[in-house]
Amino acid sequence: SKLTTADLQLNKIKNVQYVREQGSITEMFDIIFLSYNEPKAAERFEKLQQRVSELATVSKRKPNLIWIKDIDGIFNAHQHASNRVTSNMFWVVDGDADVLDSFDFSYMPDVYDEEVVHVWNSMNLINGLEYGYGGVKLFPTQMVRDATTWGLDFTTGLSSRFKAIPELSCYTRFNTDAYSAWRSAFRECVKLSLNDDIESKERLDAWLNPNPDADFKDDAKAGAEQAVAFAKENKDNAEVLLNINNFDWLKIQYEQDNT
């Protein structure tokens, strides 16, 4: 049978293990720090800068670190980021992510995973959940540049080739003020409400019942409750649902429902 490029890229050849050439040095992927008015974004970026400097000292390789701030729309922000990087894949760290010192930014996917969106876990301080929400992500650059559709969730909607990596990458510290806590809960819980699987329902229940000692827990709870109602009312209206990726719309929605 004929051997195709797709066979190589998708690892469809039996009994073959892909390895990188021993002794070869690969450039690290660019890191995008993506923020939108997070109160402690500058503090988080400074910490990430320090981490990158430490990487350069230890591994003699230093990834480019780029701060993309206050771009309207989730999709627009990621596409803008993709046009700023020079590596064939790029990391995305959210503005409210507190990245663990142990997280490995030198990670290199196998050749058949270079067109796959990777997502690492995050620890959610509002509800104690550990899953991909708020986690560090790795995107194929050209895929993001070429994207014209992406669905309600940019990360999972960008491509059918998606890889969830069950390793903790960061703490997602979005609950720094009332609006940020509400916004994060509202966006995520709209998505969870539209899913019908057991795991999504369990996660939604956790958002609706936050940890009693979590900062701004009442605001996050309100966001979750309002998200459930919003998703139920608009479940058949994709255009309205997409507003959860519009930060200007979210601010107006928050002020209407919570003031």
Question: Regions from the language model: what does each represent?
Answer:
Residues S1, N88-L100:
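Short beta-strand-to-loop acidic/aromatic patch adjacent to the donor-nucleotide binding site
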